[in-house]
Regions:
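Flexible, gly/ser-rich surface segments that form the specificity/activation loops bordering the active-site cleft
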Residues: 1-41, 76-82, 97
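Short, well-ordered loop/turn sites that connect or cap secondary structure elements
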Residues: 5-6, 61, 143, 170
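Structural motif
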Residues: 9, 146-148, 174
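Active-site region of chymotrypsin-like
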Residues: 24-79, 125-130
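Short beta-strand edge segments in extracellular beta-sheet folds
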Residues: 30, 196-201
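Conserved PDZ fold ligand-binding element
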Residues: 65-68, 138-160
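C-terminal cap/linker of serine protease catalytic domains
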Residues: 67-124, 187-191, 200-203
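PDZ domains, with a preference for the canonical peptide-binding region formed by the helix
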Residues: 87-88, 151-179
Length: 203
């Protein structure tokens, strides 16, 4: 369970480490409980002090030999970011991939509405849509950036992780009902309902 990993906890990387296909390295968790929101999914990110190269890949284990994450090395401009994706945040994705049934895709990127943000901007409960991919199922259905999604097929959406799991449990061609709130010209929120025909998740 990667959600229980604490700061300064010892971790071990096994796999391709420092270009060694059978390499390993030990280190510790510098930061935990950081969320990275991507299209249709949210990752729990752990930052460690383990040095990895751009072409490295490794499984990350805790001191009790329990799998807690997968290395995630990306290059953004000239910067190489070396993080770990918490295994608990991608459990549903792994299960769906293992089943051989491709997961559905909606094409939205969202962020959680924290209590502070809700109070500061008077946002209702739900998750805030930051981006809708052009020509995605959500785009074709009418969803927009700025919408606040609070219900998915009758289920309450309390966090981006909830939403991600719901999407991953859907399949291509499924029609799902999305309830959301959208601000009008006067700043008031209108409740809207859309039917989205799910696409295919390719990664």
């Amino acid at each position: 369970n990667s959600y229980g990993v604490k700061q300064n906890e010892i971790v071990i990387a096994l796999g391709r480490v420092q270009s060694n296909a059978k390499g390993y390295a030990a280190g510790y968790v510098k930061e935990n409980n950081t969320l990275e929101n991507d299209v249709d999914i949210s990752y729990d990110i752990l930052e460690t002090n383990i040095e990895l190269k751009e072409d490295d890949y490794a499984l990350i284990f805790g001191v009790n030999a329990n799998l807690i994450g997968i290395s995630h090395v990306t290059k953004v401009g000239d910067e190489i970011r070396k993080n770990v994706i918490g295994i608990s945040s991608v459990k549903t994705l792994i299960e769906e991939m293992s089943s051989g049934i491709p997961a559905g895709s909606m094409g939205v990127k969202c962020t959680n509405i924290t209590k502070d943000i809700s109070e500061q901007f008077n946002f209702p409960e739900g998750i805030y849509v930051t981006e809708v991919e052009v020509d995605s199922p959500a785009y074709k259905a009418g969803l927009q950036a700025g919408d606040i999604i609070y219900e998915y097929n009758g289920g309450t959406v309390g966090s981006v992780q909830d939403f991600s799991d719901m999407i991953l449990m859907s399949e291509k061609g499924d029609s799902v009902t999305i309830k959301l709130k959208r601000t009008g010209r006067g700043g008031e929120y209108r409740e809207l309902e859309y039917t989205v025909k799910m696409g295919l998740r390719l990664d």
